[in-house]
A protein has these predicted regions:
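Conserved GNAT acetyl-CoA-binding A-motif
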Residues: 115-127
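Conserved beta-strand in the GNAT
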Residues: 61, 67-77, 88, 93
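Active-site rim helix/loop that mediates acceptor-substrate recognition in acyltransferases
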Residues: 34-63, 69
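C-terminal "cap" of GNAT-fold acetyltransferases
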Residues: 124-129, 143-167
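Helix-loop element at the rim of GNAT/NAT acetyltransferase active sites that forms part
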Residues: 19, 26-40
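Conserved N-terminal entry element of GNAT/NAT acetyltransferase domains
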Residues: 1-24, 161-167
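Conserved glycine-rich acetyl-CoA-binding loop
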Residues: 82, 95-106, 118, 135
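Conserved acetyl-CoA-binding loop-helix of GNAT-fold acetyltransferases
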Residues: 91-94, 100-113, 125
């Protein structure tokens, strides 16, 4: 069991079929990362991800007191030009009330462990957030292009077995 910064129990779990928090999770992923009218995209993607709990894509939530306080997803591709790289970490989110308590770092570490369980040696992400991922051992390895043609930095980290940052 992990604990939040206020000492209350916190758990990180993969969304599974019939999860009672599924609807709330869809809403949070969509409202945080989606576009207006795009809820069906997230619901469909997340529903179909539930067919193989050991594969990708997979969606995860951090829960405290029955409230979703963080999210991330492991995806085959994060809608960018680098189709040769996989898997991708996407949708990393920490509730503003939980920021500063290392939940983001815990979710990043959890993602690396889950990536290794799926047989991958590394994980990728795109972000224009400078300095955040680097402090957790992620390396900038270049750029990808999104569907609008804009460049966005690519970050890479190894799973724990392959030498991921253990801090």
């Amino acid at each position: 069991m992990r604990y939040a910064k206020d000492g209350q129990p916190l758990r990180v779990q993969q969304l599974v079929r019939n999860d009672r928090l599924f609807g709330r999770a869809v809403d949070l992923f969509w409202k945080t990362w989606g576009e207006e009218g795009g809820r069906l995209f997230y619901e469909d993607a997340m529903t179909h991800a539930l067919t193989d709990v050991e594969g990708t894509p997979s969606f995860y939530i951090a829960v405290k007191d029955d409230v979703i306080v963080g999210t991330y997803a492991l995806l085959r591709n994060d809608l960018n030009s680098r189709q040769d790289l996989q898997p991708w970490l996407a949708c990393l989110y920490v509730d503003p009330e939980m920021r500063g308590g290392a939940l983001g770092a815990k979710l990043l570490g959890h993602a690396l462990v889950e990536t290794e369980k799926r047989g991958y040696r590394s994980l990728h992400l795109t972000s224009d957030l400078h300095g955040y991922y680097e402090k957790y051992g992620w390396k900038n390895i270049g750029v990808a292009y999104n569907t609008s043609g804009e460049s966005i930095p690519i970050f890479h980290n190894y799973t724990r077995k392959e030498g991921a940052d253990q801090s």
